[in-house]
């Protein structure tokens, strides 16, 4: 596309150079800039990428978007705008022909449950023989092909490229986990959502948002930014068991479908049966009651299942068809995942990293604990420490507790575990400043019949260490290796 055509959509302050050049790519990553691409510089939290403008020029890039004039070679065109990342979003969607308009787009937000609901929607679509894509905490996936991702919600240009990739691969729908950070930072500008889903709102990320009010407002942006065009078939799916849903109803003009277990809703779960092999329940709907069976464990996953089913149903698939698909869904990686059922202990990993998430996790497993419940939890570095003692208190619902760091970054691991220990309600706990050693200890003290829960990381494949260096780490592999060494079995797979 000709750059002059591309920039007709943008109000610019000044153009230094010529826009008469062909553009086939846009990037905010200086390492990928080249001839034919636009490099968009921005001022980030730790890096101002304007300093890389000459480097991208040396790589052949002839057009940069900046917030103030740079000292560059004369053959490099500079487009000066007030908000470079907002412009990046407009340019990306224009250049790639508004890819989110070309498929059904589901957006899932909430403190807990985003990954599970989004993955369930994707897996249901696949069981229905529909081409589907997923983007979120567990990476990027088109049908069964997976790639890793850095953030739950990538920056705006990368996000647009992922949607374009899904469209080019023939995806009929795409499900995105929508983080509060991504909403506030404008990473989702220009994405046309067809269905917006809310799971819950509990304390988290106050290091970024400051207050629960600001955090809630951030989540609400997904719904308020659906637009006002009532000729479009857009829908909202809300959890009536969370009171924040009442507010979300007021910020969107589109039809709302509610679900709940404890509070009255249009879609409800009754006669719930739970085991470590899954759940079953009566799905009470405006159209009748259906029996639902699922391999997912825990009452909270019933809420997630209902949200996913309603979202897919809202776009035209019958409930009967969806319910059949749900019976045979694969596990959501790292979410109440039972590792190797042949072991004499129940070894479980989960991503729960808030007090609310931990409470729900313990509620789910406690009825099936045959002997002791051993619970390991970590606290992340450079995060909101006001939630930490409450996490320690909840962890002490278990018989024995292990406190570790989780992505300590530049914080002292001993300080993080001490903050968790402040909430301890009994003395049956131990602190480890090395998470891997904490996991090995959990297995070492476990006896046949015990349940060992490794919480807060799921299958996250790294630890963030000082200098924000990512060091390879897998709770599941460390736990399994220790369990096989003690009890026999294996080998550990990748």
From Swiss-Prot:
Pathway, per record: Cell wall biogenesis; peptidoglycan biosynthesis
Post-translational modification: Carboxylation is probably crucial for Mg(2+) binding and, consequently, for the gamma-phosphate positioning of ATP.
Main location per the UniProt record: cytoplasm
Residue sites binding ATP per the record: 110-116
Organism: Staphylococcus aureus (strain MRSA252)
GO (cellular component) term, any one: cytoplasm
Annotated UDP-N-acetyl-alpha-D-muramoyl-L-alanyl-D-glutamate binding sites: 30, 152-153, 179, 187
Signal peptide: none
Biological process per Gene Ontology, one example term: peptidoglycan biosynthetic process
Enzyme class: ligase
Motif (L-lysine recognition motif): 406-409
Keyword Chloroplast annotated: no
Keywords, alphabetical: ATP-binding, Cell cycle, Cell division, Cell shape, Cell wall biogenesis/degradation, Cytoplasm, Ligase, Nucleotide-binding, Peptidoglycan synthesis
Modified residues (N6-carboxylysine): 219
Function comment: Catalyzes the addition of L-lysine to the nucleotide precursor UDP-N-acetylmuramoyl-L-alanyl-D-glutamate (UMAG) in the biosynthesis of bacterial cell-wall peptidoglycan.
Entry keyword Kinase: no
Enzymatic reactions: UDP-N-acetyl-alpha-D-muramoyl-L-alanyl-D-glutamate + L-lysine + ATP = UDP-N-acetyl-alpha-D-muramoyl-L-alanyl-gamma-D-glutamyl-L-lysine + ADP + phosphate + H(+)
Entry-linked InterPro entries: Mur-like_cat_sf, Mur_ligase_C, Mur_ligase_C_dom_sf, Mur_ligase_cen, MurE/MurF_N, UDP-N-AcMur-Glu-dNH2Pim_ligase
Entry similarity comment: Belongs to the MurCDEF family. MurE subfamily.
PANTHER family tied to this protein: MUR LIGASE FAMILY MEMBER, UDP-N-ACETYLMURAMOYL-L-ALANYL-D-GLUTAMATE--2,6-DIAMINOPIMELATE LIGASE MURE HOMOLOG, CHLOROPLASTIC
Localization (cell): Cytoplasm
Annotated GO MF terms: ATP binding; magnesium ion binding; UDP-N-acetylmuramoyl-L-alanyl-D-glutamate-L-lysine ligase activity
EC number(s) from the headed UniProt entry: 6.3.2.7
Protein name, as recorded: UDP-N-acetylmuramoyl-L-alanyl-D-glutamate--L-lysine ligase
């Amino acid at each position: 596309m000709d750059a002059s055509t591309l920039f007709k959509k943008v109000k610019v302050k000044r153009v230094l150079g010529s826009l008469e050049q062909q553009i086939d790519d846009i990037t905010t990553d200086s390492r990928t800039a080249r001839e034919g691409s636009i490099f968009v510089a921005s001022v980030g939290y730790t890096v101002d990428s304007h300093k890389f403008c000459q480097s991208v020029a040396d790589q052949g890039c002839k057009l940069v978007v900046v917030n103030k004039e740079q000292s560059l070679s004369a053959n490099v065109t500079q487009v000066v705008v007030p908000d470079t990342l907002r412009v990046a979003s407009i340019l990306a969607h224009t250049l790639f022909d508004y890819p989110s308009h070309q498929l059904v787009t589901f957006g899932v937000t909430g403190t807990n449950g985003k990954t599970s609901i989004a993955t369930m929607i994707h897996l249901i679509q696949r069981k229905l023989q529909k081409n589907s894509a997923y983007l979120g905490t567990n990476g990027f996936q088109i049908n069964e092909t997976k790639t890793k991702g850095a953030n739950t919600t990538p920056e705006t240009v990368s996000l647009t490229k992922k949607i374009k990739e899904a469209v080019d691969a023939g995806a009929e729908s795409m499900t995105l986990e929508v983080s509060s950070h991504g909403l506030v930072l404008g990473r989702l500008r220009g994405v046309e959502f067809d269905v917006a889903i809310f799971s819950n709102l509990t304390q988290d990320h106050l290091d970024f948002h400051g207050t629960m009010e600001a955090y809630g407002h951030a989540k609400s942006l997904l719904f308020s930014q659906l637009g006002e065009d009532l000729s479009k078939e857009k829908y909202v799916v809300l959890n009536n068991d969370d009171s924040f849903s009442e507010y979300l109803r007021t910020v969107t003009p589109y039809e709302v479908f509610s679900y709940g277990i404890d509070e009255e809703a249009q879609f409800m779960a009754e006669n719930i049966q739970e085991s470590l092999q899954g759940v079953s329940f009566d799905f009470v709907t405006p159209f009748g009651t259906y029996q639902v069976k699922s391999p997912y464990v825990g009452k909270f996953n019933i809420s997630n299942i209902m949200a996913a089913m309603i979202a897919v149903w809202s776009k035209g698939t019958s409930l009967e068809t969806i319910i059949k698909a749900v019976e045979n869904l694969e596990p959501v990686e790292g979410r109440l995942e039972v590792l190797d059922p042949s072991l004499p202990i129940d070894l479980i990993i989960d991503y729960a990293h808030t007090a609310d998430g931990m409470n729900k996790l313990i509620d789910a497993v406690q009825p099936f604990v045959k002997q002791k419940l051993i619970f390991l939890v970590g606290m992340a570095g450079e995060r909101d420490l006001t939630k930490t003692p409450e996490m320690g208190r909840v962890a002490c619902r278990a018989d024995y507790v292990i406190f570790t760091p989780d992505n300590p970054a530049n914080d002292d691991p001993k300080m993080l575990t001490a903050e968790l220990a402040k909430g301890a309600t009994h003395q049956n706990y131990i602190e480890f400043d090395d998470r891997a050693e904490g996991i090995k200890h959990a297995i070492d003290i476990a006896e046949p019949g015990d349940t060992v829960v490794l919480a807060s990381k799921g299958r996250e494949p790294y630890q963030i260490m000082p200098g924000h260096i990512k060091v390879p780490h897998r709770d599941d592999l460390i736990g399994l290796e220790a369990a096989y060494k003690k009890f026999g079995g294996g080998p550990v797979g990748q």
